[in-house]
Each structure stands twice: as structure tokens, then as C-alpha cells.
Amino acid sequence: LKNYDPADEMLGGFTSRDGTIEFYNRINALLQPGFKVLDLGAGRGAWYYAKIPEYKRILRNLKGKVAEYIGADVDTAVLGNPTTDRNVLIKDGVLPLGDGEVDIVVCDWVLEHVVDVASFKREVDRVLKPGGFFCARTPHSFSYVSLAARVIKNSSHVKFLRWVQPNRGAQDAFPTAYRCNTLSAVSRRFGGWKSYTYLYTAEPSYYFGSKPVFHFMNLIHRLLPRAMTGSLYIFLRKP
């Protein structure tokens, strides 16, 4: 059975180990009406065009829940992102935002693509208010997803992702680097920040749209160490 989705069998359209529900539940708990939130690496807003249940769409949508929701990316596609109040283009690694302008920085499946982590961290630190939150979701460096991405050349990455994730668009696949994708790397890069980071294993995402393969991968998730199946759910508070 191709294009199988285990969430279709669950009331509400999501499983008990839905990583997006887990991540955005926690972000929503931090929101305040007067906040400014930056979606760093927002891209074209791919989730907006995806077929997802209404509950997940409401949870994922931060626009209207805060004073301003800003999208930023190095890709000009962000300028047409319909999910935000305002979009800005990152040029030469610099965010066109003021110092201490935002209360929360959200980085969803972006950190694994960052090559110059030091510059990235400096910009996050600059635009984030003291006491603000940096919230990121990224694969662990030792997960089978990360290991496979290292083996497969970036030029073949798009074809591979379309094979194992049939519902993923080619325009939403990008080269990977994995420079800040372990708990120790996060602690080292963000020294002095209060960390609420944890390792979370969601249901398998890479199963070729096949029900038997999904259940096999689910078994693998139970047997392998968490670092090989999980992702980092990074929640840091700036001092």
C-alpha cells in the first residue's frame, strides 16, 4: 500500500508520537500576545501547502497568536511565504532585524543545514531579547537519517527523499551539514544559555509510503539506541 499514513487510522489525524505535535505544543505554551516571533529558515512555508489535519494546522500556524510573526531565509522563496505577517531575506549571513527585536526564534528542520554555526549563533543571539527562547527541531547527528544523508551525495539527496518520502516536494530538500546536532554540540555552542533540550523519537518518517515498511521501521525504532532514531528538540533560554 503506497502513500500509507499511520495518522489516517487515528482519531484527530495524528499519532501518539507525532513530532510536529510535540514540538509546536511546547512552542504554543511559550507564546504571549505581545511577542514577536521569528521563523528562521521559514522558506516558502511548505507546511501550508501540505495535506495535514486541521488540528495540526492550527497548532503549526503562529500567525495571529502573537504581535508579529516574521519569516526569514536565504532563499528568495521566503518572500512569498503566506504563513507570516512579514518576510525578510538574509543577506551575507545577516538578519535585517534590530538587536533584541524578537522574543522567540523558531528553527524547524533548519539547523542540520547550517554550515557556519558560529555566525548563525551570533545572529540568533543578536536579534533575540534577553530571556527569549530559541526553539529548534533537528535530526541527531547519529540518527540513521543523518547517517544516510552523509552517505548519499547532496546531488542525489532530492531523488532519495522523493523515494522514501513520496509526499515531499523536491523544492523542500536542501544540502545537509550536521554541525550542531548532538547534545554536547548544542551545549558547547550555546554555553551559558539555560537548556531544556531533549532527545525525542517520533514515528518513522522514511518508509516509502508503505505500511509494511512503516511497521518494520517502527520495530527498528524500538530496538536501536535513541540517538540513532531520535531528533533533538532544542529549547534554550537566553540569559
Model regions and ranges:
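Class I SAM-dependent methyltransferase Rossmann-like catalytic core
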Residues: 1-30
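S-adenosyl-L-methionine-dependent methyltransferase catalytic module, highlighting the catalytic core
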Residues: 2-6, 115-123, 127-129, 133-239
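Pocket-edge positions in alpha/beta enzyme catalytic cores
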Residues: 12-15, 54, 94, 178
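Short gly/ser/thr-rich secondary-structure transition/capping motifs
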Residues: 18-21, 52-53, 86-87, 215-218
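Amphipathic coiled-coil/heptad-repeat helices and related helical stalk/stem segments
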Residues: 20-24, 54-55, 120, 182
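Short secondary-structure capping/turn segments at boundaries of alpha-helices and beta-strands
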Residues: 24-27, 57-59, 221-222
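Amphipathic alpha-helical segments that form well-ordered structural scaffolds
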Residues: 26, 61, 185-189
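Conserved SAM-binding loop
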Residues: 30-146, 233-238
